[in-house]
Amino acid sequence: MPDPEDELTPILSRAERNAYRLLLKNDLDPFEFDVAIHAGRVLDGRVTYVLQISTLDHAVSVRETGIPLEFIERSGTAGGDAFARIVDQLVPALIENMKSSRHVPETMAR
């Protein structure tokens, strides 16, 4: 019997790659950030997921919890889907947190 975790790995990896593309679309250098998606809480008998975007040294990060698997499964490279909206909503908070902590990646400092 296949392990459900193994079946989810390509889905989560694709969504992470899409998040990196969305960072680039928001004028952020994706090589300056780390994107991670992992299982979170169980709500109504279903596992939800956590999206975390942080600077490479993890000094600054933002996260969204309670993301349904369906949002992750349907994430696309062009954006415009529910997952893309979540990423787009996290970007301003990420930038604000970097500015307030004076932790600005090199590419943004130029």
Locate each region found by the language model.
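Residue-identity detector for glycine
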Residues: G40, G45, G66, G76-G80, ...
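Amphipathic alpha-helical interaction modules
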Residues: N26-G66
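Short, charged, intrinsically disordered terminal tails
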Residues: P4-D6, L94-R110
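Generic structural signal of hydrophobic/aromatic residues within well-ordered alpha-helices
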Residues: A19, F83, V87, V91-L94, ...
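Negatively charged, low-complexity tracts enriched in Asp/Glu with abundant Ser/Thr
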Residues: M1-R41, A78-R85, R110
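Intrinsically disordered, low-complexity regulatory segments enriched in Ser/Thr/Pro
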Residues: Q52-Q89
